[in-house]
Amino acid sequence: MQSIFGTDGIRGIFDKELTYSLAYKVGYALGVSTKTNNPILIGRDTRVSGYILIEAISRGINAAGKEFIYLGICPTPAIPFLIKKEKFSGGIMISASHNPPEYNGIKIFDNNGEKIKKKLENQIELILETANNLKLSTYKKTSIRENNNLFNIYTEGLINTMGDENLDGMKIVLDTCYGSATTCAASIFQKLGANVKVINNEQDGLKINLNCGSTCLDPIIKAIKENNADMGFSFDGDADRVIGVDSEGNIIDGDHILFLWGRELLEEKLLTNNTIISTKMANLGFENTWKKIGGILHRTEVGDKFIFEAIKKKKALLGGEQSGHILSKINDFCGDGILTAIQISKYCKKKNISLRSWLNSSFSPYPQKLTNVLLNFKFKNIDKSYKEFINETIESFSNIKKDNCRVYIRPSGTEPVLRILVEARNQQEVDSLSTKITAELSTKIYKISKTF
């Protein structure tokens, strides 16, 4: 049996790779594998398929003899935050993060509020194999009610991270991308005193992430300029990521957020060994400038679970990804886009500086180009020998190195594509090398796939 888990749980197109039956069995498997009788916390984003999958998972949990509590539509970080605070035995978030509406996913958390480790993934898959003959009709339909009191604990927790600080007088635009951030992002900023303009704020599972949010910044850039705002923040579908935009439309991605936030902690002498954690996607300009001010950047594979593992190992206080997924000790590394946004806003207010000026004081990024090579197969589902051959092919291209030039290639953990990152000091070299590698790699992968 091929693993159903990718870099961030289980993900796929609803009713094709991710079915009602699979969700039911995952709920059952988690229920069987939990070590306590405390309820399992479940939530979802706004996708149309979300409620169907919630019903399947909750029935599976009940079939295993365990109870669940339904949080409703919520940001993903609400699940691990509340697991830790309220002592749930585990949690499930139904979301495909930044992916289009037809996708959905299952993110699973253990009783510590952490993404489950490989050992538990294997245990769940083993239970799934033995649960193939489990009959859905044996179990009655489950009553599903939202728990608003728990959600309020989460939002109050975010507000409390600000202490006595506020955002009075700040004009801020938020793009909630028809997703989880629609539940609370605007109200949290308003309670902190900000003058808020919010766009794409309907809970619409057919529009989630479409031409909006952290992967499409044109709408928020336009709204910032039209409203003469100080800054803006654009979230992804489940609000665990955020990208900032200054008053002139310049983008503050995860690298910039890590550098600016990290530098504040460095100056306050709070960073363990002056270290922050990022991934192999992090910009060389970021790393080189961070080193110049006395910092150490530790890189991991792409994925917040790898960042979290490195944070624990290095005893770091801050880590994240260029995509805007930031993990901070402030909320026990729950990876919360709304938390990141209010903290960045707080620093600007506290320092009496515009986000534009703060960005200018950071680093000059090297030009990067990220290209996707479409695969006619899912990398994780192919035979081991083919996988090794493709990995060798990828490695041969990844080893292309010149002065101040970097190539990083990886299979997507959520989509049937290879992601090719090329980085160099000038755009011409980036474009030339990217075109060459993409063409050659596409040809080789196509030839390999014809032998399947």
Curated annotation (Swiss-Prot):
Cited InterPro entries: A-D-PHexomutase_a/b/a-I, A-D-PHexomutase_a/b/a-I/II/III, A-D-PHexomutase_a/b/a-II, A-D-PHexomutase_a/b/a-III, A-D-PHexomutase_C, A-D-PHexomutase_C_sf, A-D-PHexomutase_CS, Alpha-D-phosphohexomutase_SF
* Modifications after synthesis and translation: Activated by phosphorylation.
- Which cofactor names does the annotation list? Mg(2+)
One Pfam family of this protein, by short name?
A: PGM_PMM_IV
The region annotated as signal peptide is none
Give the E.C. number(s).
5.4.2.10
Query: Which EC main class describes this enzyme?
Result: isomerase
Modified residue annotations for Phosphoserine: S97
Q: Does the keyword Nucleotidyltransferase apply?
A: no
Return one GO MF term.
Answer: phosphoglucosamine mutase activity
**Active-site residues from the entry:** S97 (phosphoserine intermediate)
What GO terms fall under cellular component here? cytosol
Cofactor details (free text): Binds 1 Mg(2+) ion per subunit.
Record SUPFAM superfamilies: Phosphoglucomutase, C-terminal domain, Phosphoglucomutase, first 3 domains
Q: Name one GO biological process term.
A: UDP-N-acetylglucosamine biosynthetic process
The record ties this protein, via PROSITE patterns, to: PGM_PMM
Which keywords, in A-to-Z order, does the entry hold? Isomerase, Magnesium, Metal-binding, Phosphoprotein
**What family is this protein classified in?**
Belongs to the phosphohexose mutase family.
Q: Which HAMAP family match?
A: GlmM_B (MF_01554_B)
Protein's name according to its UniProt entry? Phosphoglucosamine mutase
Origin species, per record, is Prochlorococcus marinus subsp. pastoris (strain CCMP1986 / NIES-2087 / MED4)
Gene this chain is encoded by:
glmM
